[in-house]
Amino acid sequence: MKSMVKKLKQSLRSGSLEKRKEKEKDIQEEKWFLDNGSIFLKELIADCNGKSIPIRNFSSDQILKATSNFGSSCFVTAEGFYVWYKGIIEDRSYMIKRFSEYKVTQYRVAEVYNEIVLSARMSNHNNFLKLIGFCLEFSLPVLVFEYAEHGVLNHRGGVIVNGEEVILPLSLRLKIGKEIANAVTYLHMAFPKILIHRHIKPRNVFLDENWTPKLSDFSISINLPEGKSRIEVECVQGTIGYLDPVYYTTKMVTEYTDVYSFGVFLMVILTGKPALASTSSDGDYKHIASYVKGFHENGQLDGVIDPKVMEDITSAQKVHVEACVVLALRCCELRDENRPKMIQIAKELKQIETLFRRS
């Protein structure tokens, strides 16, 4: 009898403890929701200028169930201070972006909200990854984006689908270059203040079921002051290999900061080589612009194109691909005043891609 009473008391205490833990969890989630929500609302009101931007709010239970508690089976890719997962909510697939609370310092918290607000602003453009909603019930917001059936480009401008590398034909590579150029041009021209992305690279470009490229990651994007062509920042941010040398040495952000990064991006997807490649056993690295420029100066531009796709194009098409490589080199001129503007780049790429298809 005493044993039964003892077990009953233990059971009641255990149940009480579980209820208390559950209540504490609910209180913590509510606090995160209110804290994150107030910050986001303030930022969104400041940005949307009275326009309605429909964004869905997801619960933590939905996110955890969709990603198997952020399990490895749902992992897509990791980049910097965040991880991408595939998740299924109400029979629909989504890309779910989780920021690491251990890597996001107080200084970088603002970047998380920058990402939400600017992604929401770009949701109507077909070449940006569309923000569907978010969950505020974690220490940092978890973002839910449209699904990208064919994943994300890797550091060589390729893509892995179902565990196997897919060789992208040159026609698709040119299409990707053209449409990402259109997206960046939109950032530079569609708003009263020029918006500089600052993080253009293959690993921020997703591909949907129709192989349409979707630019993502606005965490370090910045507006230039209205009527101004540059802004000085406290620290340089971005990815080594894609950083504009002028920006890197002066901390001055201009529209040509994006032009340089785009030029590197274009070279990477055309050559199938990373932005920085090891050249010898001593650990030295050579920038892709230097690599491509060497071939250009020797009149051997066809030698830089990814050999896996060169045999599939005609001699007439090769001329247009080489024109694209030359354009990429112009984007990477060391003096930023010698670089073309994004609108000019977009126009030239449209023409190159059209001529390539007709050849």
Swiss-Prot record:
It comes from the Eukaryota. GO terms for molecular function: ATP binding; protein kinase activity. It holds the Pfam family Pkinase. ATP binds at residues 70-78, 97. GO terms for biological process: cell surface receptor signaling pathway. InterPro entries: Kinase-like_dom_sf (IPR011009), Prot_kinase_dom (IPR000719), WAK-like (IPR045274). Residues 64-356 form the Protein kinase domain. Residues 1-20 are annotated as: Disordered. Residues 1-10 have a biased composition (Basic residues). Keywords: ATP-binding, Nucleotide-binding. SUPFAM superfamilies: Protein kinase-like (PK-like). Belongs to the protein kinase superfamily. Ser/Thr protein kinase family. ZRK subfamily. The protein kinase domain is predicted to be catalytically inactive. PANTHER family: NON-FUNCTIONAL PSEUDOKINASE ZRK2-RELATED, WALL-ASSOCIATED RECEPTOR KINASE-LIKE 21. This is Non-functional pseudokinase ZRK2.
